[in-house]
From Swiss-Prot:
Disulfide bonds join 178-216. Homomultimer. Heterotetramer composed of 2 holin and 2 antiholin. The holin-antiholin complex binds dsDNA. Interacts (via C-terminus) with antiholin (via C-terminus); this interaction blocks the holin homomultimerization and delays host cell lysis. Interacts (via N-terminus) with the lysis inhibition accessory protein rIII; this interaction stabilizes the holin-antiholin complex thereby resulting in a robust block of the hole formation. Induction: Expressed in the early phase of the viral replicative cycle. The gene is C1. GO terms for cellular component: host cell plasma membrane; membrane. This is Holin. Accumulates harmlessly in the cytoplasmic membrane until it reaches a critical concentration that triggers the formation of micron-scale pores (holes) causing host cell membrane disruption and endolysin escape into the periplasmic space. Determines the precise timing of host cell lysis. Regulated by specific antiholins that somehow sense superinfections and then delay lysis. Participates with the endolysin and spanin proteins in the sequential events which lead to the programmed host cell lysis releasing the mature viral particles from the host cell. GO terms for biological process: viral release from host cell by cytolysis. Residues 49-227 are periplasmic. It is a single-pass type II membrane protein.
Length: 227
């Protein structure tokens, strides 16, 4: 029944086009008729495929909005990272707080410092992309969702892999790190809270880590929601 009705409409439409062309008496009239036919064809196709057209427009509109939101989120992420670094720098009294982001997204071949809060100045070389050591204890612990303290005052097996690239102008012997995960729950980078010297004695180490975990947790979540 639907096919018959659709065929009937198409037949009537073709008859209308034939009449319009036959009534053209000169080139100017023919051009006007052709423009009229073009408009008629567009209207006919739209009316005949209303559901498909509306579905396409809805999908296109949704995709465009989502893409725009994602672009704004990416562009604003460094600002969010700087804000979180400032908060933790004030709360912890650390010598430096920084945010590292991995790239390409979900591949994590390189790391880059996108926010830095400290009285120490970073060298330009420290801001360059650094290859990620995925065999390091830091990376493996972060993948599992755990925070990790990199303590250079404790000797470790040299084959474990370097956790954090060295800084050119300053040495940090203790860096507490908190991983953050993006909206797709993919490990995207980490927050580093750094001291030149270990800030507490070994006896207070675990309590100190618990304290840093509490401070870092809301900033981790905020970064994750922003990327």
């Amino acid at each position: 029944m639907v096919l018959v009705r659709g065929g009937y409409k198409l037949e009537k439409f073709l008859q209308l086009l034939t009449v319009l062309l036959q009534e053209a008496k000169d080139p100017a009239s023919l051009l006007k008729r052709l423009l009229t036919i073009l408009v008629a064809v567009i209207i006919f196709l739209f009316v005949s495929n209303t559901s498909e057209v509306m579905s396409f427009l809805k999908t296109f509109s949704t995709s465009a909005v989502l893409q725009d939101v994602q672009t704004q989120r990416i562009d604003n992420f460094p600002n969010v990272a700087r804000e979180k670094s400032m908060v933790l720098f004030s709360q912890t009294g650390a010598d430096a707080v920084f945010v590292v982001k991995y790239k390409p997204d979900a591949i994590n071949d390189y790391s880059n410092i996108i926010a830095w809060e400290s009285n120490a100045q970073l060298d330009r070389a420290d801001l360059a992309d650094k290859a990620v050591n995925k065999t390091s204890e830091l990376y493996r612990r972060h993948l599992e969702g755990f925070n990790y303290a990199s303590d250079l005052t404790v000797k470790v097996n040299k084959y474990m892999g370097k956790n954090i690239p060295s800084f050119k102008n300053v040495i940090f012997n203790y860096i507490y790190t908190c991983p953050y995960f993006n909206l797709n729950n993919i490990y995207a980078g980490y927050i580093g809270i750094a001291w030149r010297d270990k800030p507490v004695d070994i006896a207070d180490s675990e309590q100190f880590k618990e304290y840093l975990t509490k401070l870092c947790s809301p900033q981790q979540r905020s970064l994750g929601r922003s990327i």
